[in-house]
């Protein structure tokens, strides 16, 4: 069975078929960098990080783009409040965002395009819309004429007549109809501005993502993601302007994360009920936050509670205890000449757990169900280790490989496995140094030199000192 993805556009799960075999091109809406990023945002970016990791684990080459909105009404407003330069303010919070993502072990996007570095691309996109009759110039900017795009509402299921009902154009607005949205905003005194065919100004919000995604991923690509709050109007407007420009389908699969809730309300800066990522990281390990997010399906609402985070913390400790139990047991493990009932039970638990994990992740990246499989394997291995005096090396190796796979997909245990690998490498190097010393004692210098030379080819340089042989890593 292949991967199935819930497509917001069709409101159903669909078999995942990328446009290009073996390659996935995906775009995730990035932040407007005017403040610290909160845990609600972290939920979205961790979810798409795991989706990307799983696609890569399944053998796809993934090209991932995430934009930065570094000029916007919110940035200008905050800069006016603080007295900072809007560019410097945006640069500061962009840097903080990247630091937060690194702390949360979210893999960097392949490309992070910034709005301010793509102004000419945006102008060119708007001109195409004008040429095709979808955009017009008003007194205060350039607008997209929504009524001319016949498929408007296909993502959000919003009806145009409902938008128009009771709405009106505010005095001073230069648009024809209340539902039309800005593509280019003419500059107000003191605002950042760029030259354009319509006078000095800056881009509207929605046009940025259409321009930058098509520039780097093409006029059609596989996945567009973001939080559920972006479905309307942002993603709806993106579809309208992009498909009006290109004349064909833009994105094949639309994916949206559920809200992070606090006391029954969506966590948001506007409601003032948010916890920044930095505040959360002061209290909890990054892997606790990742596990907290993964305990719920990415489309389901997630309640932000101390109890939930403590539960994730305890679960993470349980899994680390299992890893340590396996590592320690390796020291007394024996080669398998025959299996008993305990080995067959442990093997079947690992086999079944792996299948359940893949089945869950193939079913619209259901991390909650996949985690259940992880704990089933964890419990089975701990039970096995209490049942036998000398565990079989083959069983422990299969369990170890299972948890390495989980680490690769979920982005947890990565430092642990890295340290274990480093420890194994050091032990092997020490063994080779001891073998080489023995060969030198036996005057088998050719073989001793071969060990030295081969290690050097691998980036390990041996140095013979009066105190013994030492080693260091070198570039080769």
Swiss-Prot record:
Protein's cellular compartments: Cytoplasm
EC number(s) from the headed UniProt entry: 6.1.1.16
Residue sites binding Zn(2+) per the record: 29, 209, 234, 238
Alphabetical keyword list: Aminoacyl-tRNA synthetase, ATP-binding, Cytoplasm, Ligase, Metal-binding, Nucleotide-binding, Protein biosynthesis, Zinc
Cofactor comment: Binds 1 zinc ion per subunit.
Catalytic activity, as annotated: tRNA(Cys) + L-cysteine + ATP = L-cysteinyl-tRNA(Cys) + AMP + diphosphate
Cofactor: Zn(2+)
SUPFAM superfamilies linked to this entry: Anticodon-binding domain of a subclass of class I aminoacyl-tRNA synthetases (SSF47323), Nucleotidylyl transferase (SSF52374)
EC primary class: ligase
Motif 'HIGH' region location, chain numbering: 31-41
Binding-site residues, ATP: 269
Lineage top rank: taxon: Archaea
Sequence motif 'KMSKS' region, location on chain: 266-270
One BP annotation, GO: cysteinyl-tRNA aminoacylation
One annotated Gene Ontology cellular component of this protein: cytoplasm
SMART domains: DALR_2
GO molecular function: ATP binding; cysteine-tRNA ligase activity; zinc ion binding
Family per similarity comment: Belongs to the class-I aminoacyl-tRNA synthetase family.
UniProt-recorded name of the protein: Cysteine--tRNA ligase
Annotated source species: Thermococcus kodakarensis (strain ATCC BAA-918 / JCM 12380 / KOD1) (Pyrococcus kodakaraensis (strain KOD1))
